[in-house]
């Protein structure tokens, strides 16, 4: 094992101990370290980081920038123990990685998505039930996609109206209360699921017709299919489902709609924001503040609220 590989193991352990789910970055960094090792260089160089970041060549520039950002953070950490390490400039591949602005689905968009998902064909008629209920749950709770997919039956308390979210992005569990109408929808899905699949092979709440837990990949694919069906994604050649609104935008919609409702109702958003952060599973309130900058309507409402606030008077 090379010195750089050992350093990566230490770096990965450090990030995980800080509470980060680091599987994908760690996997990418292993390919980066292998790339550096194969070049014969004993340390990270700017040119090697650039060459690695620009793979695959047909990827979007934002993907290259994201790959570079992962390598760059590792290089910053590595430089403390190996001064030979070169830290590549953040804009080395033409642009910095930035979070994509969210697409705020309208209520009509969500209804069309759910209705089209419910009509998805399948042999046992469970597929439509599963994805219509899943997409609806994401829209009204703001759960991350993996949080919903990792729900077991025991995590869904339909008597109390509470979901127990165990496998979160940062490894912390939390309780998510749900509306009575959401309870009813989950109850109806559970009854349909158990009728169609009386002997499941898993305790997963959301289940495939193969009696197994549905995967993130197939869920994202199905969402893309349904988005094209309702016109939210443009048609493309070769049967691909193109670019457009993403499934995580359902989470963004929930957060944004909550904040917009608070502003319009005159709620003290500064005081209530930590509650929304906890509900969403954000570790830092700053992650929730991001919506104020990313969504023009929220930025305008915040500016209007600030303009209405009387200035402080110092004695």
Set out the residue ranges of the language-model regions.
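Conserved catalytic core of the tyrosine transesterase superfamily
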Residues: 1-315
């Amino acid at each position: 094992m090379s010195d750089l590989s050992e350093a990566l193991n230490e770096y990965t352990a450090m990030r995980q101990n800080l509470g980060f789910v680091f599987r994908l970055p760690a996997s990418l960094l292993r390919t980066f370290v292998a790339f550096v090792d194969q070049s014969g260089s004993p340390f990270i160089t700017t040119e090697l980081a650039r060459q690695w970041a620009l793979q695959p060549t047909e990827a979007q520039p934002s993907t290259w920038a994201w790959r570079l950002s992962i390598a760059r953070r590792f290089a910053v950490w590595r430089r403390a123990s190996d001064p030979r390490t070169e830290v590549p400039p953040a804009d080395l591949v033409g642009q910095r990685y930035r979070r994509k602005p969210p697409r705020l689905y309208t209520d009509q968009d969500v209804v069309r998505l759910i209705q089209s998902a419910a009509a998805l064909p399948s042999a046992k008629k469970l597929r439509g039930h599963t994805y219509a209920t899943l997409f609806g749950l994401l829209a009204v709770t703001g759960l991350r996609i993996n949080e919903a997919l990792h729900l077991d039956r025991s995590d869904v308390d339909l008597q109390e109206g509470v979901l127990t979210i165990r496998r979160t992005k940062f490894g912390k569990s939390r309780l998510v209360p749900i509306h009575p109408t959401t309870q009813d929808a989950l109850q109806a899905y559970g009854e349909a699921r158990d009728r169609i699949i009386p002997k499941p092979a898993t305790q997963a709440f959301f289940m495939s017709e193969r009696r197994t837990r549905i995967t993130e990949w197939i869920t994202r694919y199905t969402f893309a299919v349904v988005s094209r069906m309702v016109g939210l994604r443009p048609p493309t050649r070769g049967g691909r489902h193109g670019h457009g609104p993403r499934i995580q935008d359902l989470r963004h919609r929930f957060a944004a709609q909550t904040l917009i409702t608070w502003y319009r109702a005159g709620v003290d958003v500064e005081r209530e924001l930590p509650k929304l952060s906890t509900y969403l599973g954000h570790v830092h309130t700053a992650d929730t503040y991001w919506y104020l900058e990313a969504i023009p309507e929220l930025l305008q409402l915040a500016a209007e609220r600030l303009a209405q606030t009387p200035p402080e008077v110092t004695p």
